Amino acid sequence: MSPWPPARPVPLCVLRPGREPRVEHGHDPALFVEIGSLTKVLTGTALVRMAAAGLLDVDDPVERWLPAAPACGITLRHLMDHTSGLPRLPPGIGGASRDPYAPFTDEALTGMLPRLDRLAAHPPGRHTAYSNFGYAVLGAALVAAAGRAYGELLRAHVLEPLGVAGEVTVAPPAGRSLRARGRFGRTLAGWTMDGAVLPAGGLWATPRALASVVSGLLVERRLGEPATAWQRADRLLWHNGATRHASAFAGARTDSGDWVLVHRLGGRPEDTDRLGAALLTENRSPAEEAPPYGDR
């Protein structure tokens, strides 16, 4: 007999319109969870909303707001659309570290800005290549343009208009967070995501608030046309996200208005993607299946 206890079942939360929440193994739609790269759709929406308010233009060059960056043709739109040419991760980040983003502070990002032209793998606008680094740069530019912290500008331009300002946050309220647990029931340590990487993947939210974000942005279009931070596959708009021990998938159909929010604590992020895509493409053609990014 193995001395190890069996693996814990994966907590799951699925929210869909007109259906009772599917909540398994201790998940809770009212508690705060890590949302990973779903943060990006909120950052992209903030860019579009700030442009509509006249605070900036989506085609502003990066150096307009971050003067330390060289004039290399990268615009805020390129950063939002993953066409900037910047690498997936900031230089020196990743590898075998259990907390890869801890060294990526605001000061570290500032030190990288003068090298953006040399860090880009190709000229902006030429190829699409998913970039967490690019969204960190975008977040810094938004902060400079707004003259306020990322959490504050996001609250003003996106969260309050959607009615979810109290349930999407930079840090979870004390006693209201939900985290993955190991075989022996101990809470598992997550990544440090409150530095420069915050606009790329560091937010916390309740699943019920994320459901309101999905329906509000993609179905009701309460803030106008969805930002191109969302990914598109035929008639699907979607995005996913993952941290060390959490994963999420959110999406909606542009033809029927159906939407889904899936969040899991532990397990493989790919399984979260498959479940979310399957729920959105029930009785639909195979061509409509969302092709999730491997990077989050």
Where are these regions (language model features)?
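Short, surface-exposed beta-strand/loop "edge" segments at domain boundaries and coil↔beta transitions
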Residues: 245-246, 260, 267-273
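Structural preference for long, well-ordered alpha-helical segments in enzyme cores
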Residues: 46-47, 154-157, 275
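Short, glycine/proline-biased beta-turn/loop segments that scaffold the active-site neighborhood
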Residues: 57-72
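Active-site SXXK
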Residues: 34-58, 138-143, 210
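Short, surface-exposed loop or secondary-structure junction motifs
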Residues: 8-11, 16-17, 72-249
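Short, gly/Ser/Thr-rich active-site loops of penicillin-recognizing serine hydrolases
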Residues: 268-296
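Short beta-strand segments enriched in hydrophobic/aromatic residues
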Residues: 142, 217, 254, 262-266
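A short, well-structured edge-of-sheet supersecondary motif
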Residues: 1-35, 58, 95-98, 249-254, ...
